[in-house]
Structure formats: C-alpha cells, structure tokens
From Swiss-Prot:
Domain-level remarks: Three regions, residues 59-172, 544-725 and the loop 66 amino acids, between the two transmembrane domains, known as Nogo-66 loop, appear to be responsible for the inhibitory effect on neurite outgrowth and the spreading of neurons. This Nogo-66 loop also mediates the binding of RTN4 to its receptor.
Lineage: Eukaryota, Metazoa, Chordata, Craniata, Vertebrata
Transmembrane segment boundaries: 989-1009, 1079-1099
Keywords of this entry: Acetylation, Cell junction, Cell membrane, Endoplasmic reticulum, Membrane, Neurogenesis, Phosphoprotein, Synapse, Transmembrane, Transmembrane helix
One Gene Ontology term, aspect cellular component: cell projection
Taxonomy, superkingdom: Eukaryota
Biased composition (Acidic residues): 31-54, 713-730
Gene field: Rtn4
Protein name: Reticulon-4
Organism, as annotated: Mus musculus
Residue numbers bearing the N-acetylmethionine modification: 1
Compositional bias ranges of the Low complexity kind: 7-16, 109-127
Residue ranges annotated as Lumenal topological domain: 1010-1078
The keyword tRNA processing is annotated on this UniProt entry: no
GO annotation, biological process: axonal fasciculation; blastocyst formation; cardiac epithelial to mesenchymal transition; cell adhesion involved in sprouting angiogenesis; cell migration involved in vasculogenesis; cellular response to hypoxia; central nervous system vasculogenesis; cerebral cortex radial glia-guided migration
Modification Phosphothreonine, positions: 348, 430, 834
Length: 1162
C-alpha cells in the first residue's frame, strides 16, 4: 500500500489512466497519449490494477448501457475467472459483454471520467458476487475511511487527486453481492463527483447505496467513467486488517445514510461547482481538501461550534457539509448529531443546575477556552462591574431571602437526584468566604457560579453551547440573581481563588485548584449543603421569619468574617478552618456545621474534624482548633486521644464544666448555621492577636535554651510529646483549661523574659479562649527557625507566618493521627528508641519540641500523667496510625522550609546526641510552675519521669547513627524470623530458592540461568492466564484478569527506602575504603602483616573451593547455625568461652616474645 505515493497518484481523467496490467478475459484499450504516464506508474501500481479493474469489469452492463463510448478506454482486468489466460498488454479490441455481471469496456469511459469514482465504487462492493472476492477480504464497514485515509495534499478543483492505495476505504469493495440496479447510482455518482475538489472517497457516500440508487437510476445518460479510483479500491479489497479498523464506525455511517438521504444524494447531483465547494469549506472552518485522516476530527471540532448550537442551522450545515465534502461530511455529520445527542442530557442538567443555582450564563458563553482560572474571574468582573448599579441593597436582601427559601424547598423536593446532578456539573452550594476590598462576605450562592465557570473551563465547548440555548429572560434573571447574591462584589464568584492568588500563590496554585474542582465534583459528600439550608429553614420555619432567618444567618457569617478576612490575608491564613476552606472550597462549612453539635462545649473548636477525608488536595486538617469533646461520631483515634486528655483534666473539668455546658446548652438549641456563624466568630478572635508574634520574635534570643531542653525531654520521655501537643491543640475546647494554659505559658515565659511577655499575656487572658490556639501557632515559629537556622529570625514576619500556618496545619494532623502511638511509646521504649531519625515517628518526636519549646515546657510535664493512664489502651490504635504519619510529616517538612530541609534533617539526625548535653536548668523551673498550676500530684510524677527517662537518652546518644540503625532495626525482625525459621514456609521458600539459584550457577552460566528462570516463570503465568480465561469463558463469569491484584499493587521502591539502604551501604563502603587504605599503605605494620597472613590463607581456600561453593556453604551456614545455636546455646557458649580463653593465652605468649606485638597490645 503506497501511502507515501500520493503525489504520483494525482491524476485527471485525461492524463493518468491506469497502465494495462495483464488482462485475463477482456481486451482493453488505453489512451495513446497517456502510455508514458502509465509506464511511470507501472512499477508502483501493478498489483492495484489487478484488483481495481476487476471491480469495474464486474459491474453489470445494464446500468451503464447509455454511457457514451470514449475515444480511448482505460484497460480493465478481471480476476474473477482464473481459467482465462492473461491477454497481452497494450491497446486491445473491446471485448463483447458476454457475462451480465461483467461490464464491457465500450460501456465505460474510464479515462474521461472523474477520479472521484470511489463513491460509486463504494456502492458496488455491496453488490459484487461474494464468490469472486478473495477469501481473505471481510466486508469492510465504510465508517472509518476519513479517519484512516492517508493524508493527501490538497488539490485544486480542476485536478482532483486520486486516493492512495493505502486508504482504508478500498476494502469497502469486499462487501457482499447485491442486486444489479445499483449500478446506475454508482455511475451517476461517478459523473457528479468528477469535479469535486476533495476526491478522497467519502466513506459516508460509500455507505449510501440505497439512497443513491433512487437518484441515480433516473438519469438517462452517464458521463465518462474512470477506473482510477476503482483501481485502488479493488486493490485494497484484500486488506482485511484495514477492514477491521472500520468496524466500529459502520453503524454511525449507516445511521447517517438513513437520516440524511436527500441531503447526501441531491447535493452530489445538483452541485458541481468546485469554487462554490471550496468557499463552503472555508465557511465551515475546515479544509476538506486536506488530509482525509484529519478531516473528520477537524470537522467535528469546527462544526460542533456551528452545528450543535443552532438546530435550524444544523440542517443547512449538514447539507453544505455533505454537499461540498463528499468524503467527510456523512461520517462527521453523524458524529455531530451523535455528539449533540450525547450533550443534550448534559445541557439539560446544566440548565437545571443553572436554574437552581442561579448562575450567570453569559460568563460561560465567553469563557470557552482553557485558560487559568483567573481569566474566568476577570470575565466575571467585566460582567459584574457593569451591573453593580442594577440592584439596590434592599432589593438584594429581599430577593436573596426569597431565593434562599426557594432554593431550600427546591433542594428538599429534588432530594438525592438533584444532589447527584449537582455533583456532576458543579459543587454543592456552600457558604464561602469572599473578600471585597475591606469587606468580607460569606455567600451561599456565589460559589455555584464560580464552580460553573470552572466547569466551563473544563468543558469549554459544551458549556458554550448549552448557554446559548437559554432565553434572554433567563439570562437576565440569572445575572440579576448572581449580582444580588454576590452583593455587587466582582470577586465573590470564587473568593478562594482570589484569596489564594492574593496571598498564597505558593501554597495552592491554579493547577491544584483544577484538580480540586474535578475531584470534588466526583467525590463531594451528598446533601451537606442542602441539609444546611434545609435545616436552617426548617428550624426557623415555625416562626414568622422563616426565610429571613436563613438569610440573616448568612449575613451573620458575612459580618463576622470581615475582620477574619482582614487578618487572614496579611497573616497568610493562620486560621486553619478558613485555610482549609480555600484549599477545599465545598466541604469546609458543611463539616463545620455537622461537627458543631458534637463539639458544642466550645463552638469554636469543631472546625474541621472530618476535613482530611473530604479534602481533595489531601491537605491534613489542623487539630489545633478541634475540640476535645468525646463523641461516638468522632474517629476512634480522635476519641481515644480526647479520652486521654479528658482523663488528665478530670479535676480541671469539674471547675470548667459549668461554663462550658452553659455554652453547650445555648449552642445545641441553635440551628447548624448559627453554630457555624459562632464558630467563625470565635475563629475571628483567634486570628486577631498578631502582635504576639512580634512578642515571640523579641524573646527569640531567650528561647535557644528552651527548645534544646524540650528536645531533651522528648528524647527522654517520648510520650510527653503528643500529650503536650494535644494539650495546646485540643484543651482550648475548655475555657478554663485554656486560661490555665495561658497562665502556664505566661509563667514559663516570665522565667525567661518577664518584662517582654507580661503585657502580651494580659491581652491573651482577656481574649477569647479560642485565642490560645493562635498564639500557639505563632509561638511555634521562632523556635522552629531558631533551631533550624539562627539567620532565619531575620526573615520578615509575614513570610514566617505563611509558612507556619501551612506547616502547622499539616503538622497538627500528623500529631492527630499519631497521638495514640506517641502517647503509648513508654511501654515500647526500647522499640521506639531504636527508631532512627528518618522514621516518621522520630520526626514527630523531634518536631513537636520545636513547636512547644517556648510555652509548652510546663505542659508537657503536666500531661505526663495523661499518657501514663492511656498508654496501655492506646498501643494498638497508635501502632495502626503509624503509616498515616508519614505523609503529613513529609508534607510539613517539604512545604514549610524547603530551603532548609537538608539542614533540618541533619538537625533531627543529630538531635538525640546533641540535646542530651544541654543542662537541665529549665526542666526544674517548668516542673515547679506546673506544680503551682496543676497541683501537688504532678510535680513528683514529672520529676520522677524526668529522672527515669533522662538516662536512656544519655546512653543512646552514642548509638544513634543517621539511618543505619533504623534500617537494621526495621528489618531485624523479618531477617531474624527468616534465619530462625519462625515461619517455616516462608523460610523454606527463601532458602530453597536461593540454594537452587546457587546450585544452578555451578552448572550453567548466569545468562543461561537467568533465561531459564524467565522462561519458567513465563510458562507458568501464561498457562495460568489462559486457563483462567477458558474457565471464565465456560462459566460465563467476568472475574477479569487473574493477576489484576498484583498488577495494581504498588511495587515502586520508595525514595526513603533507597536513601536508607544507600546511606547504610555508604557508611560501610567508606569505612572499608579507609581500612584498606590504612592496611595497604602500612599505617600499622602489625595490622598489615595480619592482613597479609589472611590473604595467604585465602589462597589455599580458593584452591580448595570455588567462589560459588563458598557462597553455597555460607548460605547453608546462615540458615542452620542460628537455629543450632538457639537450641544449644549453653553448650556452645561454654565451648566458645574455652576457645576464646585458649586463643587469648596463646596470643599473650606470642606477644610476650615479640616486642612489637607486645607494645601494640599495651
């Protein structure tokens, strides 16, 4: 198939008739003036002629009897009769039409006809006798030809181009035979298509035999016909492989042939003007003279924007496409029709959502291309800015009241169905935090418009067309509704993006947000926001202000969030709940609302308990703002952690419960939205005291000893860390506890610098209890940067706050997931001590010390009692939550200070050994203060715990290497189990396979062994796959791939694992190189002589044993000696002791006689 030879195949009716291939039955005459051209093409198209001319010959003569006889006819061949010997080439007298199915050469004028025969030829194959066709040719569907045709250069209308022999459509001639009367239609199509510019055959036309039959049969005379295109079609009839590719689109074209009979045929009869067709091509926005392969896609894309939108214009475009693009129009138009059908449900769903969500349609009209999200909001700005004056404040309020009520009723009426539709097209409506200049708003309806613009960004063409179907009244209503809802704020369409691009461009980017939108559309929990509105309305419906209450709650959100936004943006979103809201727009407030009743002891603490699961970006939710209230709905680890904290502060809670339960009684009766409003109110207070950050920056110089001390405490008693963190993160739930925490922090800081912190702590005591969490976040920063790098204190405050807020969110989640494990580590002291610094738990062990170094040193001692009570119960849950900690910790380190990451990791690796040397000045002070605050019970326990746990860290500092110890300890259990045959099956498999491999290497080369093993594995897997396939076919079950579980399992080697082993191996390699250098360069003569003696002994060993033999012996010894030693340890130790004693005695005698050795020994 000469796809590359398209240029040589371009011919007209006059200058390139086919060369005479060996004729079998008929004698054909070629045009004398074109014999030179035929000779040029003889080598390339010899095989093509055989099949293509056969097609022409087999046509019945009745249909073409009226055709005028051309002066010179192109040669025709017939392969249907193999018994006829081939006739000599060259001009031959015309053969009489003996057979009815054969076509006399005098009835066809191949040279004079247009090369655009393939449409006619397409009709013929279905009518050809099937026995004449080669057996390998299956009937080929006509559909895929435009897609599979090789690209041909555009040709002028005057010089139509021949189809390449590689065209897929040529297989269409292998279709089964049918009745004769179709021949006139083919001839007529040949006549009419002669002057079409894009003469690559249209698969669509090839599939219209019945349509063409009516129109073509009525024509009295036929124009001269050319065999050029038939030549290629007949040739490719053999290509069954090509035919298989068209099977998928055959039904599409058949459908097109049924739907558009008149449009597909009449244009070919009536339109012959090439110039007009070229003009129509340009109008339709696609070059139909271009490559047939690309035309279908181009036509679908371009006509989709013109055809789908206007139904009345679709008919005209279909006609024009079918008329002036005979090759492509049927297939592509059918595709357009089908795409329109496919898009119609999405259109209706989108329109339904727009009616329900009151989204501005014009925004999606203009924003129809893939651009960053900022473009969408800018487009909205242009719309909203011009319409800011349209609505007055009172009208806005009343309309929003009405709309909220209607939306709630509509949401209730539609139920799950409407919610599921919302999930497909846009996010649920949720109150969002938006900023307009100095004012901040939280609106419920603006987010749907934002998400719909996002949807327009994802599906530009679809959104573009659906919006055009709307009437002007709907557009006006939707625009007004959105203007009213957004309160004339141009940025309210997507405040999250605005805020993100304003203040946190490095934290959440538009790429992430595109993922957010797609992921949330798929995974959004159903019914949260509708429930929010429904319950708000239902709870207040009995009162006269039913809809007004729902709106007022929103206004409450709006008003209370103004100060929040003003403080959030400069401080880089230090409030985790709102930062989560920006990262994951939809789930945040629903989670707040759902969690608020559970944590109603302090309304401001239930912000984001269930957020990590709902967060598409997987940003860990902060625990610092979560409440401690122990509810069965909370996650089990969280319950247990809360139970720990509750056990600790039983005595404290007796004092605090009256106040907190009063708050709970008030909050529980309020609707969810009001609780959420109160949550936001409380969080506003927590974001305000930014001056304290500068306060901690001032006392940074006093804190260098404090982090060290706390690191020491972490080393000595790991269990204190999570409790310490949790005391700051979750105890804020109880107001008294928070005030006590403030007192504790105040006292501990006063010990360091009384004058600096006195004024600040007065502010903290007067502020809301929730405020404690914020200073905690801020207080974390100086310690972190001091321990990291002294120069980091010079970083601007805003920058530090941004990184701290992000890092603390993730870090708190890490602590939240690992609190139980950390609190239970006292029982597993030896195990946890063996963990090196690369372990996730180790990171958390080290890291909280930076967090709580300044203000939490007393609290970690006061909370030791908590961990003592709960460590037994939490061992299991803590161990289970170990894997969860890896990701948050890694995220926190990568996101918080990427520049200093290496430095921090080094600091972690060395902290165990370095921190223990710090003098214990502050531990006593903080223990004393904790005694003052918490009671007499705490001090003895703290001091005792400190005394007990200080020694292990002192002794372990020498044993801690970077990661060698970790790798050894992590793999120690599995290796020991293997060597000691704990699991006989597992050990047997490993030992047997290793021994078999080594024994095989003794017989075969390593290449042969590898090849044999691979073949054996392949034979097993292939046989099993075939066996399972047969079983499934017999049982008619659909179990899928038998190895699907293994194929989908994660086999990638983690970077941490590689680093761990590489670091361990690097240490061994370096030590070996140093030792060898010392031995070979005779740093010590005695050691070099010993090494020489060892090598001399190895010469005899090598003469007796091969290397593989030694490896086999070593393997056998490795799996046998440990078991033998375990069973006979006492006897072996006795004899080994005797042997060692004798060896030492012998060495002592030798050293006594040799002065150099004696000196070395001394």
């Amino acid at each position: 198939m000469e796809d590359i030879d398209q240029s040589s195949l371009v011919s007209s009716s006059a200058d390139s008739p086919p060369r005479p291939p060996p004729a079998f039955k008929y004698q054909f005459v070629t045009e004398p003036e074109d014999e030179e051209d035929e000779e040029d093409e003889e080598e390339e198209e010899d095989d093509e002629d055989l099949e293509e001319l056969e097609v022409l010959e087999r046509k019945p003569a009745a249909g073409l009897s009226a055709a005028p006889v051309p002066p010179a006819a192109a040669p025709l061949l017939d392969f249907s009769s193999d018994s006829v010997p081939p006739a000599p080439r060259g001009p031959l007298p015309a053969a009489p039409p003996t057979a009815p199915e054969r076509q006399p050469s005098w009835e066809r004028s191949p040279a004079a006809s247009a090369p655009s025969l393939p449409p006619a030829a397409a009709v013929l194959p279905s009518k050809l006798p099937e026995d004449d066709e080669p057996p390998a040719r299956p009937p080929a569907p006509a559909g895929a030809s435009p897609l599979a045709e090789p690209a041909a250069p555009p040709s002028t209308p005057a010089a139509p181009k021949r189809r390449g022999s590689g065209s897929v459509d040529e297989t269409l001639f292998a279709l089964p035979a049918a009745s004769e009367p179709v021949i006139p239609s083919s001839a007529e199509k040949i006549m009419d298509l002669k002057e079409q510019p894009g003469n690559t055959v249209s698969s669509g036309q090839e599939d219209f035999p019945s349509v063409l039959f009516e129109t073509a049969a009525s024509l009295p005379s036929l124009s001269p016909l050319s065999t050029v295109s038939f030549k290629e079609h007949g040739y490719l009839g053999n290509l069954s492989a090509v035919a298989s590719t068209e099977g998928t689109i055959e039904e599409t074209l058949n459908e097109a042939s049924r739907e558009l009979p008149e449009r597909a045929t009449n244009p070919f009869v009536n339109r012959e003007s090439a110039e007009f067709s070229v003009l129509e091509y340009s109008e339709m926005g696609s070059s139909f003279n271009g490559s047939p392969k690309g035309e279908s896609a181009m036509l679908v894309e371009n006509t989709k924007e013109e055809v789908i939108v206007r139904s009345k214009d679709k008919e005209d475009l279909v006609c024009s496409a079918a008329l002036h693009n005979p090759q492509e129009s049927p297939a592509t138009l059918t595709k357009v029709v089908k795409e329109d059908g496919v898009m119609s449900p999405e259109k209706t769903m989108d329109i339904f959502n727009e009616m329900k969500m009151s989204v501005v349609a014009p925004v999606r009209e203009e924003y129809a291309d893939f651009k960053p999200f900022e473009q969408a909001w800018e487009v909205k700005d242009t719309y909203e800015g011009s319409r800011d004056v349209l609505a007055a404040r009172a009208n806005m309020e009343s309309k929003v009241d009405k709309k909220c009520f209607e939306d709630s009723l509509e949401q209730k009426g539609h139920g799950k169905d409407s919610e599921s539709r919302n999930e497909n097209a846009s996010f649920p409506r949720t109150p969002e935090l938006v900023k307009d200049g100095s004012r901040a708003y939280i609106t419920c309806d603006s987010f749907s418009s934002a998400t719909e613009s996002t949807a327009a960004n994802i599906f530009p063409v679809l959104e573009d067309h659906t919006s055009e179907n709307k009437t002007d009244e709907k557009k006006i209503e939707e625009r007004k509704a959105q203007i009213i809802t957004e309160k004339t704020s141009p940025k309210t369409s997507n405040p999250f993006l605005v805020a993100i691009h304003d203040s946190e461009a490095d934290y959440v980017t538009t790429d992430n947000l595109s993922k957010v939108t797609e992921a949330v559309v798929a995974t959004m929990p159903e019914g949260l926001t509708p429930d929010l509105v429904q319950e708000a309305c239902e709870s207040e419906l009995n009162e006269a202000t039913g809809t007004k209450i729902a709106y007022e709650t929103k206004v409450d959100l709006v008003q209370t969030s103004e100060a929040i936004q003003e403080s959030i943006y400069p401080t880089a979103q230090l409030c985790p709940s709102f930062e989560e809201a920006e990262a994951t727009p939809s789930p945040v407030l629903p989670d707040i609302v759902m969690e608020a009743p559970l944590n109603s002891l302090l309304p401001s603490t239930g912000a984001s308990v269930a957020q990590p699961s709902a967060s598409p970006l997987e940003v860990p939710s902060p625990v610092s703002y979560d409440g401690i209230k122990l509810e069965p709905e909370n996650p089990p680890p969280y319950e247990e952690a809360m139970s720990v904290a509750l056990k600790t502060s039983d005595s404290k809670e007796e004092i605090k419960e009256p106040e907190s339960f009063n708050a709970a009684a008030q909050e529980a009766e309020a609707p969810y939205i009001s609780i959420a409003c109160d949550l936001i109110k409380e969080t506003k207070l927590s974001t305000e005291p930014s001056p304290e950050f500068s306060n901690y920056s001032e006392i940074a110089k006093f804190e260098k000893s404090v982090p060290d001390h706390c690191e020491l405490v972490d080393d000595s008693s790991p269990e204190s860390e999570p409790v310490d963190l949790f005391s700051d993160d979750s105890i804020p739930e109880v107001p008294q506890t928070q005030e006590e925490a403030v007192m504790l922090m105040k006292e501990s800081l006063t010990e360091v610098s009384e004058t600096v912190t006195q004024h600040k702590h007065k502010e903290r005591l007067s502020a809301s209890p929730q405020e404690v969490g914020k200073p905690y976040l801020e207080s974390f920063q100086p310690n972190l940067h001091i321990t990291k790098d002294a120069a980091s204190n010079e970083i601007p405050t805003l920058t530090k706050k941004e990184t701290i807020s992000l890092q603390m969110e993730e870090f708190n989640t890490a602590i939240y997931s690992n609190d139980d494990l950390l609190s239970s580590k006292e029982d597993k002291m030896k195990e946890s001590e063996t963990f090196s610094d690369s372990s996730p738990i180790e990171i958390i062990d080290e890291f909280p010390t930076f967090v709580s170094a300044k203000d939490d040193s007393p609290k970690e001692y006061t909370d030791l009692e908590v961990s003592n009570k709960s460590e037994i119960a939490n061992v299991q849950s803590g161990a289970n939550s170990l894997p969860c900690s890896e990701l948050p910790c890694d995220l926190s380190f990568k996101n918080t200070y990427p520049k200093d990451e290496a430095h921090v990791s080094d600091e972690f690796s060395k902290s165990r050994s370095s921190v223990s040397k710090v003098p214990l000045l502050l531990p006593n002070v903080s223990a004393l203060e904790s005694q003052i605050e918490m009671g007499n019970i705490v001090k003895p326990k703290v001091l005792t715990k400190e005394a007990e746990e200080k020694l292990p860290s002192d002794t372990e500092k020498e044993d801690r290497s970077l990661t060698a110890v970790l790798s050894a300890e992590l793999n120690k259990t599995s290796v020991v189990d293997l060597l000691y045959w704990r699991d006989i099956k597992k050990t047997g498999v490993v030992f047997g396979a290793s021994l078999f491999l080594l024994l095989s290497l003794t017989v075969f080369s390593i290449v042969s062994v590898t090849a044999y093993i691979a073949l054996a594995l392949l034979s097993v897997t292939i046989s099993f796959r075939i066996y399972k396939g047969v079983i499934q076919a017999i049982q008619k079950s659909d179990e899928g791939h038998p190895f699907r579980a293994y194929l989908e399992s994660e086999v990638a080697i983690s970077e941490e694992l590689v680093q761990k082993y590489s670091n361990s191996a690097l240490g061994h390699v370096n030590s070996t190189i140093k030792e060898l250098r010392r031995l070979f360069l005779v740093d010590d003569l005695v050691d070099s002589l010993k090494f020489a003696v060892l090598m001399w002994v190895f010469t005899y060993v090598g003469a007796l044993f091969n290397g593989l033999t030694l490896l086999i012996l070593a393997l056998i010894s490795l799996f046998s000696i440990p078991v033998i030693y375990e069973r006979h340890q006492a006897q072996i130790d006795h004899y080994l002791g005797l042997a060692n004693k004798s060896v030492k005695d012998a060495m002592a005698k030798i050293q006594a006689k040799i002065p150099g050795l004696k000196r070395k020994a001394e």
